[in-house]
Design a protein with these regions (language model features):
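A solvent-exposed interaction/effector surface
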Residues: 3-205
């Protein structure tokens, strides 16, 4: 009897997880964002976000930070849970060379509507906490990276070369926006991850 109850409980948990996963936005197809494969400079307005500050290797602390962000975000009322109004998560790190990844001070964020003014209690875990913030933009240079996160360097170099060739210089942190990546239950195919790499830039007079 106990074994049967345990099996039922496990099935319920798996089913609940599957329902959540099925309801999550899948991200765009490569065809929908193909225009981003070439670097470009655009104007972006400020974005209200849920934000977590976390120091350490993004491959380790990033999972915890995004887990807390998602838990907080999907517990809020009045935020889009899917559709065209849903905006994917993003993160920022310093761009100085020579800083070990363990020393990176990352900002992990989930965009929210400007009308959101408070997030309530229960938005903290494991020494991390969620806060409301506004990310400033202005002129930005960006490019789409297709594939694994650890294979981004050539794409980053293309974007940085483009910035210099257009008479601009980087102003601010390295930013990534995760259009398509690992899901809650399954990692997916890393070779098909879609990531926008972005820098705030200013004209180099």
């Amino acid at each position: 009897m106990k074994i049967a109850l345990i099996v039922v409980a496990i099935l319920v948990i798996l089913l609940a997880g599957l329902v959540v996963w099925m309801g999550m936005p899948r991200g765009p197809s490569l065809e929908e964002v193909a225009h981003l494969r070439e670097p470009l400079i655009v104007e972006m307005g400020p974005q209200r976000v849920l934000q977590v500050r976390a120091k350490g290797n993004p491959n380790e602390v990033g999972k915890q930070a995004f887990g807390l962000l998602m838990k907080t975000y999907f517990g809020l009322k009045g935020v889009p849970k899917g559709g065209p109004s849903f905006k994917p998560p993003r993160a920022r790190w310093p761009v100085q060379a020579g800083i070990p990844m363990e020393e990176w001070e990352g900002l992990y964020a989930m965009p929210v509507p400007e009308t959101l003014t408070e997030i309530g209690v229960g938005s903290a875990a494991g020494g991390l906490s969620v806060e409301l913030a506004t990310w400033e933009y202005g002129e930005v240079a960006q490019i789409l990276h297709v594939g694994r996160y650890n294979a981004e360097i050539p794409t980053v170099e293309i974007l940085q070369g483009f910035i210099r060739s257009q008479g601009y210089e980087i102003e601010g942190l390295h930013e990534e926006e995760y259009l398509k990546g690992p899901g809650f239950l399954f990692p997916g195919n890393p070779d098909k991850y879609l990531t926008v790499i972005r820098y705030r830039v200013k004209k180099n007079f």
